[in-house]
Amino acid sequence: MDGETAEEQGGPVPPPVAPGGPGLGGAPGGRREPKKYAVTDDYQLSKQVLGLGVNGKVLECFHRRTGQKCALKLLYDSPKARQEVDHHWQASGGPHIVCILDVYENMHHGKRCLLIIMECMEGGELFSRIQERGDQAFTEREAAEIMRDIGTAIQFLHSHNIAHRDVKPENLLYTSKEKDAVLKLTDFGFAKETTQNALQTPCYTPYYVAPEVLGPEKYDKSCDMWSLGVIMYILLCGFPPFYSNTGQAISPGMKRRIRLGQYGFPNPEWSEVSEDAKQLIRLLLKTDPTERLTITQFMNHPWINQSMVVPQTPLHTARVLQEDKDHWDEVKEEMTSALATMRVDYDQVKIKDLKTSNNRLLNKRRKKQAGSSSASQGCNNQ
């Protein structure tokens, strides 16, 4: 493409359809060579930004021959960029993983870059979809089915010795707006092979970061299991188990609560949630990574492998996400900015029971509820 990217061209650009998908799920070996000719020969690029990945922005594009809408991610060539492409290519074609359709190696402003063409996930983010349901109830059974799908993606990665290391809501996208849309995991910017004990780099998203990432301990696939616990927690109530009380992306207090496993299951949001679900969260959020469930154990847990018989209890999730929409967006922005600024804190991890947790969003909700209650009872409650 020699200097031209989606940032500079008008018109849409989707990736070409690759039968079966490359990588571990498609061609044996999982690695393919990037195409060296201009991406614009095959795709029409658009200025429409679809999202921001760890290492680069994602733009809309269209396959010239088929008209298929795709997503293009531009990475300036570096060992880190090559690693991201390698890991995503290896995983592409796996269940519930965004598929790579093509990769190009082009020059842009005199610099070599890699352009990843992926299937376009037009259904948006996981929690946005739940948030948009309005009065339609989101049930515990639906949460279990979603967790089973995410677990299926992680199981595929872990079975091929890849740790994703950045499993978070923004990286879980739906293929379309339709009811039968498929949820898929994307953005392999922090993914690493786990065969060489290499997972020691402090790059992560604070609200979904495992305790050992915040200290000197090595961490591996169990990081992804911790993230599954946090996502499952949010699915079942609408807010995260850990919060920064200072407004910073991650505060010393929040680090401490993550390290000590300080979270709770407060009412009314958790009053009707099954004990099976709470037990599974406890097993995922263990502060000692050696005690945390493996992905195989997670997939074999009754709440996951018998998700069709999980109670269809209506949850508070959709309402909470909608009511706290502004705060949720702010939290996501904080997480993004924190990726570049967080540093490892070498305090020792200690496990401690918690009687009460100080969750900023939850306290705000409780205060609001107390105000409504006191107004109806005619008493003034601070």
From Swiss-Prot:
Region of interest called Autoinhibitory helix, as start-end residue ranges on this chain: 307-343
Family annotation (SMART domains): S_TKc
Activity modulation comment: Activated following phosphorylation by p38-alpha/MAPK14 following various stresses. Inhibited by ligand 5B (2'-[2-(1,3-benzodioxol-5-yl)pyrimidin-4-yl]-5',6'-dihydrospiro[piperidine-4,7'-pyrrolo[3,2-c]pyridin]- 4'(1'h)-one) and ligand P4O (2-[2-(2-fluorophenyl)pyridin-4-yl]-1,5,6,7-tetrahydro- 4h-pyrrolo[3,2-c]pyridin-4-one), 2 ATP-competitive inhibitors.
Main location: nucleus
Residues that bind ATP: L50, G51, L52, G53, V54, N55, G56, K57, V58, K73
Motif (Nuclear export signal (NES)) on chain: 335-344
Entry function: Stress-activated serine/threonine-protein kinase involved in cytokines production, endocytosis, cell migration, chromatin remodeling and transcriptional regulation. Following stress, it is phosphorylated and activated by MAP kinase p38-alpha/MAPK14, leading to phosphorylation of substrates. Phosphorylates serine in the peptide sequence, Hyd-X-R-X(2)-S, where Hyd is a large hydrophobic residue. MAPKAPK2 and MAPKAPK3, share the same function and substrate specificity, but MAPKAPK3 kinase activity and level in protein expression are lower compared to MAPKAPK2.
Name of the molecule in the record: MAP kinase-activated protein kinase 3
Species name: Homo sapiens (Human)
Gene transcribed to yield this protein: MAPKAPK3
